[in-house]
Amino acid sequence: MHAEVSRITLNIAQRSRALRDDYRRQIDEMSRQPVHRSQLSCGNLAHGVAACGSADKSVIKMMDSANIGIVTAYNDMLSAHAPYAGYPEQIKSALNAIGCTAQVAGGVPAMCDGVTQGQPGMELSLFSRDVIAQATAVSLSHQMFDAVLMLGICDKIVPGLVMGALQFGHLPTLFVPAGPMTSGLSNKEKVRVRQLYAEGKVDRAALLEAEMASYHSQGTCTFYGTANSNQMVLEAMGMQLPGSSFVNPDTTLREALTTEAVEHIAKIARTGRQALPLAEVIDEKSFVNGIVALLASGGSTNLCIHLVAMARAAGLVITWSDFDELSKVTPLLAKIYPNGSADINHFQAAGGTGLLFGELIKAGLMHGDAKVCFGGTLDAACIEPFLDEGHLQWRPAATASLDTDVIRSADKAFAPEGGIRLLEGNLGRSLIKSSAVAADRQTITAPAVVISHQNELRALFERGELDRDCVVVARFQGPAANGMPELHQLMPILGVLQDRGHAVALVTDGRLSGASGKVPAAIHVTPEASKGGVIGRVQDGDLVAINVASGELNVMVDEDVLAAREQARAPAPRSTVGRALFAFNRNLVTDAESGGCTLFEAPVLVDEPIEAATQSVAYGHCVS
């Protein structure tokens, strides 16, 4: 293993020891005193099987065959989740064929951030992750199941499902993906039309035509945003079958992979011979693997919030410093839009996850000995599925890229460091997605343009007041202010200004869509403005400096002057479109670096760094 990866992994384990021990005690208690249908009263069990057919009733009450719980995020408005409509019946049929059963344990909400971008509903988006975690726990609380299949893909859905599933870590769990839509209008062309619309050079009809040509069918959006980053991370953590993430919906291979996942879950269920509880798989190694895969592929910054919350649900404490330190030793091996012109289908065709993970394991950057939920270890999961006369088979993944413009080997990386960096300074701590930003754009010092709402920037642009170098400071967009919405609507305007030759950047305590790219954006600023952060004392015209190479984020104002300034007043919270129901979330939520979470308190960090010399003893690997 690479010395730094081992050190960071050990630091996570050490700082998490008390929380992790508590988590394991909770799981051990559920294992020793089975939270299971065998412990239900006759009345309880009768209610649990009342809606089943007579054959399923007979199997379930015998207790010796697996009954699988399905937690589904299906709805037919969300393109990525629409394919799930028929999955429960396919799952039940496949299980019945091997003498097992399944029940839909529950459904969870699934927002589409593409629908809510720039709309009031976006203020519910981050909080929906915690609602999904709670809904997952409610679904599994009936104690009817021997294992779990999760049907979910998109932005907050996967993190929420993982967080909920980890509370039932005594149960084996697998995710079942549905795959990306086929390639439509290129992402680059879509963004070009968006910028033309922002400038008033094309009308709404032309914009809608371009958008609908890009988002055109069932399946995940093809850009490498949060949804596809979720899929990359799930596979890297061993939570779904190898090579299954990016197979298109409504194909024979997709259907075969779903059946294969069903057969695997029956084998590793509590009733099976190869029982493999989720809590035995998900640990500090699996989280480091997920982070490294994210960084090497230039994935979404949203995962820097979600992985922290997911880890906390497993009794582990991950910080942004872990992301930053891993990024410094993880080369960028993939170029997928917005980091390049290729989409996720091109990535799959170039070699996909098996090639990427194989390169990272070979470089000592991923823990190849980490367990995976379907049995075995990650290094044995660098394989890819294919059909041979209609039957699913597996073969070794490609060991050389089939398109070096999309995936490269570690020794010929696109960049020596990963795609996400930590920035620090008198404005606080922040993250920047550097992989999509040109090298000559990664340092900027320019006057601040301060806004408290996305619409303010459009008004300034339309009045011609932004035709200059500037750093847009979007404050009061953090978790406690308004739920930390994504501010993707700002990017077409900033992209236009950049294309006109101006030096522009964004600094915000809010989030950005995983699709955001070429404009440098210091996001997730902590402390946020509504919690007294310095970002709330920045004024129009202040010079703001971003330097990715040195990891600095500062407002160039004397500290005494800053301290003497009155904190800006937060806008009054809005209560329409359901936002009144989430007031308690805004009051309870932790800061962005603690996961923007309402379910767990922010941990008190006491780091005792591990020296490199001890690493080989702890993990049994040679330090290289």
Segments predicted by a language model, with ranges:
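N-terminal small/polar loop signature for handling phosphorylated ligands or for N-terminal nucleophile
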Residues: A105-Q143
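Glycine-rich beta-alpha loop segments
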Residues: Y84
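A short, small-residue-rich loop immediately preceding and capping a beta-strand
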Residues: S139-L161, L174-V176
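Catalytic or ion-coupling anion/metal-binding cores of large enzyme and transporter domains
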Residues: M1-A66, T72-D76, A80, E89-V108, ...
